[in-house]
């Protein structure tokens, strides 16, 4: 599903030299290298932000230089040895490469900020656009950096005003929406319309409409670039060039169709026509999830309506096949921002638990033929989950959002990385599996109960890691310091932190009993917090130097924070992240 990552992976497997035993190793080398460069860009990002506190020039004093490098070192190493990032760095998956693109894009925009007033500075914006196009073929999470990039541009080019700030938010939404809901879906949509017209209408060969549309799109875009260049329309030239390179990056998805046409052994969804590719790109095999409006989990369908038409490839033309089915529900069981929506039977009990619901409020009682209530073995009244009584309230809906989606599926992972982790057993709310801990006994026992009497396989789990809140505290110090010293940059990092964290929680709208832990989805948010960990070092140095004017201060603070945060994290995480001598057989 990630074609550019697949191409990169194929390139790295060439270094196996035909030895299939080394293919897995070379794929993991790709993740390792991508992760290493991610840390490099994080180091450069932190040092860039610290340099702005002292004025962006080359003549720094020795204490300032040590502060800059020490902050970058501590912040970058803290992220290096964080639980989520370290795990993704040692597996052959897209998330290490995705982290690299996120880090590269954010750093590149800061690089543009330095030279924004120089000739040809827009080449950095075009590079970023190209990376965005490539990232579509790796993971769509990278697009969430766009609002932060828009504000870097706004703060550099325009004086701050309230209206300008609001317009920048609007521009962020428009650009992000244009890529996600115009470029990505509409290019294959229009290609499919041309394909249908050329094949069914003009009796031309298969794929002729797709080829014609792509040639036409490229030709019109190139002409627009040439025309705006001749007319010296710099802004429009940059926009069209950026659009062009986004399409070039997005074109990696053509490899998906090429592989499917070749009928490779692994050919999920068979996307060999533009119509099946369109379904593949829209992730229709995963179904729909309501975002801002939809039915609650105990709603029952009232009718079925026909949805979109799909087409099947025949011998010499495309045939219309059955349309998708769309269920409609009683409006009383629909609501705004539905978080408890999944109608799968096993999820109902979880919604009842997490949102503190009562079955008696949601369902009618089961009754026998005489109309008497049916009781279970323990004498409890049984309720018919196929006979809804009333929908949950909005407050109950939001309780699930905060307790499960925010608390269990985001904050728990955040605390894994910056406070500590109980074990690597997947948990669904149990006090003994997969919770966050701090290592401070009375705080952990207040939440989870006594931890000493647990079985050895839980108590002595390799992933039992304790950081005593030290990374979290240092990051919060850096956050506060950042807003006090340079609120504009702090706002930009906050956007990155929120959009790659809580915003993903809102968009995914996850149901309970997830098949695996999902911390990898929020690696970008943890990356942003690592920036504040680095700035926390700067905050401590500057606070102490107000009283002690000595070069020993930045050296001492760097060494102490290095030992208390990244070294502590490395020592705690090493045993459960070291993959030496781990084999499947």
Residue ranges and their predicted role:
Residues 1-21, 32-33, 40:
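Short hydrophobic/aromatic helix or loop-helix immediately within or flanking a transmembrane segment
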Residues 14-15, 20-28, 53-68, 75-99, ...:
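Aromatic- and kink-enriched transmembrane "portal" helix at the membrane-lumen/periplasm boundary
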Residues 29-60, 104-108, 473-480:
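Transmembrane-helix motifs of polytopic, lipid-linked glycan transferases
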Residues 55-58, 62, 66, 105-124, ...:
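Membrane-interface transmembrane helices that cradle and orient dolichyl/undecaprenyl
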Residues 70-73, 115-133, 162-175:
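Short hydrophobic alpha-helices at membrane interfaces in multi-pass membrane enzymes
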Residues 113-114, 145-177, 181-239, 561-568:
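Perimembrane helix-loop-helix junctions
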Residues 174, 243-247, 483-487, 531, ...:
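Signature aromatic-anchored transmembrane alpha helix within multi-pass, membrane-resident enzymes
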Residues 514-538:
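Hydrophobic/aromatic-rich transmembrane helices and adjacent perimembrane loops
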């Amino acid at each position: 599903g990630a074609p550019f990552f697949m191409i990169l992976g194929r390139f790295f497997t060439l270094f196996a030299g035909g030895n299939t035993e080394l293919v897995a190793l070379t794929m993991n080398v790709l993740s390792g290298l991508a992760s290493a460069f991610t840390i490099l860009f994080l180091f450069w990002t932190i040092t860039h932000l610290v340099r702005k506190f002292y004025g962006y020039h080359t003549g720094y004093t020795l204490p300032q230089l040590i502060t800059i490098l020490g902050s970058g070192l501590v912040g970058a190493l803290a992220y290096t040895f964080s639980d989520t990032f370290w795990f993704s760095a040692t597996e052959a998956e897209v998330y290490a490469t995705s982290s690299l693109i996120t880090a590269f894009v954010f750093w590149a925009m800061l690089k543009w900020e330095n030279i924004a007033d120089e000739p040809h500075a827009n080449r950095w914006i075009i590079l970023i656009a190209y990376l965005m196009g490539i990232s579509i073929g790796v993971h769509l999470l990278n697009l969430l950096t766009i609002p932060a990039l828009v504000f870097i541009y706004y703060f550099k080019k325009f004086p701050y005003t309230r209206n300008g700030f609001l317009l920048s938010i609007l521009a962020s939404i428009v650009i992000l929406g244009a890529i996600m809901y115009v470029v990505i879906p509409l290019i294959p949509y229009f290609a499919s319309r041309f394909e249908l017209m050329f094949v069914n209408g003009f009796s031309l060969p298969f794929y002729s409409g797709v080829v014609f549309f792509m040639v036409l799109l490229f030709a019109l875009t190139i002409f627009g670039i040439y025309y705006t260049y001749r007319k010296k329309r710099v802004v429009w030239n940059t926009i069209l060039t950026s659009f062009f390179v986004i399409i070039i990056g997005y074109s990696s998805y053509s490899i998906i169709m090429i592989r499917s046409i070749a009928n490779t052994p692994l050919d999920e969804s068979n996307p060999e026509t533009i119509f099946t590719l369109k379904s593949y790109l829209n992730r229709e095999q995963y179904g729909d999830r309501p975002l801002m409006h939809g039915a609650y989990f105990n709603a029952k369908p009232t009718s079925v309506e026909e949805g979109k038409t799909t087409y099947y490839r025949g011998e010499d033309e495309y045939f219309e096949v059955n349309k998708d089915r769309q269920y409609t529900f009683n409006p009383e069981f629909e609501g705004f921002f539905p978080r408890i929506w999944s109608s799968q039977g096993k999820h109902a009990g979880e919604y009842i638990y997490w949102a503190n619901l009562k079955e008696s409020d949601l369902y009618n009682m089961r009754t026998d033929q005489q109309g008497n209530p049916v009781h279970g073995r323990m004498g409890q009244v049984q309720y018919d989950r196929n006979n809804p009584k009333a929908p949950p309230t909005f407050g109950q809906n939001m309780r699930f959002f905060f307790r499960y989606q925010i608390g269990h599926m985001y904050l728990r992972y955040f605390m894994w990385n910056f406070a500590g982790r109980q074990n690597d057993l997947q948990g669904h709310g149990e006090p003994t599996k997969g919770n966050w801990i701090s290592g401070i006994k009375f705080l952990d026992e207040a939440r989870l109960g006594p931890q000493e009497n647990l079985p050895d396989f839980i108590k002595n789990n390799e992933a039992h890691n304790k950081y005593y809140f030290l990374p979290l505290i240092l990051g919060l110090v850096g956050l506060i310091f950042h807003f006090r010293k340079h609120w504009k940059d702090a706002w930009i990092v906050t956007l990155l932190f929120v959009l790659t964290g809580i915003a993903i929680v809102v968009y995914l709208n996850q149901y309970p009993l997830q098949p695996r832990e999902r911390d990898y989805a929020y690696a970008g948010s943890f990356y942003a917090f690592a920036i504040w960990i680095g700035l926390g070092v700067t905050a401590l140095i500057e606070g102490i130097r107000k009283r002690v004017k000595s070069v020993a201060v930045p050296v001492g603070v760097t060494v102490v924070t290095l030992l208390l945060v990244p070294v502590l994290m490395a020592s705690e995480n090493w045993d459960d992240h070291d993959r030496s001598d781990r084999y499947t057989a």
